[in-house]
Swiss-Prot record:
Ranges spanned by the short sequence motif 'HIGH' region, renumbered to the chain: 129-139
GO annotations of cellular component type: cytoplasm
Major enzyme class: ligase
Gene3D superfamilies recorded: Arginyl tRNA synthetase N-terminal domain (3.30.1360.70), HUPs (3.40.50.620), Isoleucyl-tRNA Synthetase, Domain 1 (1.10.730.10)
Organism: Geotalea uraniireducens (strain Rf4)
Subunit organization: Monomer.
Any Pfam family hit: tRNA-synt_1d
Keywords: Aminoacyl-tRNA synthetase, ATP-binding, Cytoplasm, Ligase, Nucleotide-binding, Protein biosynthesis
GO molecular function: arginine-tRNA ligase activity; ATP binding
Subcellular location: Cytoplasm
Protein biosynthesis keyword on record: yes
Protein name: Arginine--tRNA ligase
HAMAP family associated with the record: Arg_tRNA_synth (MF_00123)
């Protein structure tokens, strides 16, 4: 509806410029919003106020000129008015709103989708966990947010590439190998010989057992057979990384999260990309040596202090391979890149961007874009749950999926803005009551399916969309539902463009609430065949929209509950 009104305004502006009613020739960005109060109409725009200066006219005068034209062409409106300092308020006819139902029925599974992205390439990197243990709840929230952002962007026409970056090099991987080796040798965590900063979860014991049993592990591009020699630390490292990559893959598959590309930090070193980037930075003149270390002048690009690239011992700091990795993204043609990461990565953003700018590779300032999510606190019985037996020191994603199910886990992870801390209430997520938001939404869909099953049993066949007497939908409740249905494409677009999946969960709860309230107050199947047909058609559109919105969140729309 907003797009239709925007097109009408643009058309009438052009007409006014053509005949001299308005003279500036300026086409401002036309913003159409829903007024705070219903008595001010369905939509409002401040376009006249934006034009006033260029036209050298009072905003209300410009608004009156536009309204006089729009009254002739905006036949979807019952009334237009100039309000306040120069707003134009639009009152859309009920019959125009009802036509939304026809559009929903025609679009079916595609309702809400658009081609805003025009098929342009965009890469989203998310999860990117170190292969040192099971995925924890922070990874889980990142997986849900990242995957939903991908689904949203695809829904509005972007060509999305999902990428996972494995930090499979560095000290953490060395600690993993030492921990598995200790288990292979029968050394326990309370033994003085246990490695410093070693991993103590039960999963280390599982990896060691599989390694000694000379098992074969397949994980993405790796096919690794354990050597079984507890003294071969390099073989242990390769096997442990492959084993834990496979476990992470299995957890993500159970979460219905999939990737198109897997990139390895170790490959950046093996292919010489890290050394090549360091040399390019040296050649660019943005580095200097001090205290035996190589520094990058990141302050030139907005950092609060310069950063060490290569330590005195010859090792690279962690942001250097990150710069090499992101350069590879740029060279692969991704001019738009989104990184979904935990908020603990905030400090690396400036360093990575500074390194990319220093390369003089034509990469724009502010590339890549970041979505950072805050921590998750898991509660059960009013108390925080902090550990998992298998992981040893944290709650795993698998723990949540096994306890509350995939749908509830995904919904809860995205139901708050990414930069807000999230309390995951296990007891609430398990409830099969309307207090549980995901149950509340899914039950609305199942309830509508049950209504249609009942109608079919009673011999009622819904006529073709064009034959449904939509004019029978006249109550405030019915029109409110229709207007909410009509807003779904805008919700989808806003959620995608702002990387805010929680907007869809809010929308789902609003629509489900309107349906439950309507159904509790009104009979759908009545003695009045026309009213029954109209209300069934309305509920068909509600069910379609609920399913489409749930699908974009990666959540099922059950027909029975």
């Amino acid at each position: 509806m907003k797009e239709l009104l925007r097109d009408l305004i643009t058309k009438e502006l052009a007409s006014c410029f053509a005949d001299g009613s308005l003279s500036s020739g300026v086409f401002p960005s036309i913003v159409i919003e829903k007024p705070a109060h219903a008595e001010h109409g369905d939509f409002a725009t401040n376009v006249a106020m934006l034009l006033a200066k260029a036209e050298k006219k009072a905003p209300r005068v410009v608004a009156e000129i536009l309204v006089s034209r729009l009254q002739e062409s905006a036949d979807i409106c019952s009334k237009l008015e100039v309000a306040g300092p120069g707003f134009i308020n639009f009152y859309v006819k009920d019959e125009a709103w009802r036509q939304t139902l026809i559009a929903i029925d025609r679009a079916c599974a595609d309702y809400g989708k658009s081609r805003i992205g025009e098929g342009k390439k965009i890469q989203v990197e998310f999860v990117s966990a170190n292969p040192t243990g099971p995925l924890h709840i922070g990874h889980g929230r990142g997986a849900a947010i990242g995957d939903t952002i991908c689904r949203l962007l695809a829904a509005i026409g972007w060509d999305v590439t999902r990428e996972f970056y494995y930090n499979d090099a560095g000290q953490q991987i060395a600690n993993l190998a030492l921990s598995v080796q200790a288990r292979c040798l029968g050394i326990e965590p309370d033994d003085p010989r246990w490695p410093l900063d070693g991993y103590q979860g039960d999963y280390i014991r599982d990896v060691a057992r599989s390694y000694l049993g000379q098992e074969t592990v397949e994980a993405d591009d790796q096919h690794v057979t354990a050597a079984g020699d507890p003294q071969d630390l390099d073989a242990i490292r390769r096997f442990a990384v492959a084993y834990l990559r496979r476990e992470q893959d299995q957890d993500l598959t159970a979460f219905d999260v999939h990737f198109d590309v897997y990139s390895l930090e170790s490959a950046l070193y093996a292919e010489g990309r890290v050394e090549a980037v360091v040399q390019r930075l040296i050649d660019s003149g943005h580095t200097y040596e001090q205290d035996g270390a190589l520094w990058l002048r990141t302050t030139t690009f907005g950092d609060d202090k310069d950063r060490v690239m290569r330590k005195a011992d010859g090792g690279y700091t962690y942001f250097v391979p990150d710069v090499a990795y992101h350069l590879s993204k740029w060279e692969r043609g991704f001019t738009r890149v989104i990184n979904e990461q935990g908020a603990d990565h905030h400090s690396t953003i400036t360093r990575v961007r500074a390194g990319l700018q220093a390369l003089n590779a034509g990469i724009p300032v502010g590339w890549p874009e970041y979505v950072l999510h805050q921590m998750v606190t898991v509660m059960r019985g009013g108390e925080e749950v902090k550990i998992s037996k298998r992981a040893g020191s944290y709650v795993t994603l698998r723990d949540l999926i096994d306890e509350v199910g995939r749908d509830a886990t995904r919904f809860f992870f995205v139901m708050r803005k990414p930069d807000s801390q999230l309390v995951f209430d296990i007891d609430l997520a398990k409830q099969q009551t309307l207090d549980n938001p995901v149950y509340y939404v899914q039950y609305a869909h199942a309830r509508i399916c049950s209504i249609f099953e009942n109608a079919l049993e009673r011999g009622f066949v819904l006529p073709a969309a064009e034959s449904v007497p939509l004019e029978r939908l006249v109550t405030l409740e019915e029109m409110t539902i229709i207007k909410t249905l009509a807003s779904f494409p805008e919700i989808l677009e806003g959620s995608a463009l702002n990387f805010e999946p929680h907007r869809v969960t809010y929308y789902l709860q609003e629509l489900a609430g309107q349906f439950h309230s309507f159904y509790n107050r009104n009979r759908v199947i009545t003695e009045d065949a026309e009213l029954t047909a109209a209300r069934l058609f309305l509920l068909k559109c509600v069910a379609l929209t609920l399913k489409n919105a749930l699908t974009v969140l990666g959540i099922s729309a059950p027909e029975k509950m």
